[in-house]
Swiss-Prot record:
Belongs to the universal ribosomal protein uL13 family. GO terms for biological process: negative regulation of translation; translation. CDD domains: Ribosomal_L13. The keyword Ribonucleoprotein applies. This is Large ribosomal subunit protein uL13. SUPFAM superfamilies: Ribosomal protein L13 (SSF52161). GO terms for molecular function: mRNA binding; structural constituent of ribosome. It comes from Pyrobaculum islandicum (strain DSM 4184 / JCM 9189 / GEO3). It comes from the Archaea.
Length: 185
């Protein structure tokens, strides 16, 4: 995996860039992605390792917020409520965060969102391509601060929808074996 560090001003005008989201704070990375999509109409952005994105805040508070939002969906007791659906999977959560930063009611925002792809882990066809790190916010820096509290999107997903997370984890193990076979490692 080749990692290249760049700032937002140094991004190419067209083509496709792959951003490794490992250890990034979800909101900060989303602002960079949204701004790049709006400023460069011929640039496609692919974000990989979405499950390793970080949400800052107390672990229990963040998980309870997601659980509360999901429980506000239509229920047996309140069948009339059909409010906004909150995604559970980390890739969809990040895409939803970016969508909130784009002007989705006009054509520019909708086309920008169509040019964004978000994946959990790294797809096989993108293994040997250059990954881009926009800025340095590793988990180690978050752990150094004594009051810094954070939770990864994978942990949130595990606490919200354990069955789906467990199924993904099993598929991930099979995927890792396949990658080793393909790369010869």
């Amino acid at each position: 995996m080749i990692i290249e560090k760049r700032e937002l001003e140094q991004l190419p005008e067209r083509g496709e860039i792959i951003i490794d989201a490992d250890g990034h704070i979800a909101g900060r990375l989303a602002t960079y992605v949204a701004k790049a999509l709006l400023e460069r109409p011929s640039l496609r952005i692919v974000v990989v390792n979405a499950e390793k994105l970080v949400i800052t805040g107390d672990r229990k508070m963040v998980i309870e917020w997601f659980k509360r939002k999901i429980s506000e969906w239509r229920t047996h007791y309140n069948p009339e409520k059909a409010g906004p659906k909150i995604p559970r999977r980390p890739d969809r959560v990040f895409k939803r965060i970016v969508r909130g930063m784009l002007p989705k009611k006009n054509m520019r925002g909708r086309s920008a969102l169509k040019r964004l792809r978000v994946y959990m882990s790294i797809p096989l066809e993108m293994l040997n391509r250059k990954k881009l790190v926009l800025y340095e916010v590793p988990l180690a820096k978050l752990k150094v601060k004594p009051l810094a509290k954070f939770v990864t999107l994978e942990e949130v997903w595990r606490n919200i929808d354990f069955a789906a997370w467990e199924q993904w984890k099993r598929a991930q193990e099979i995927w890792q074996k396949r990658i080793k076979q393909v790369t010869g490692g």
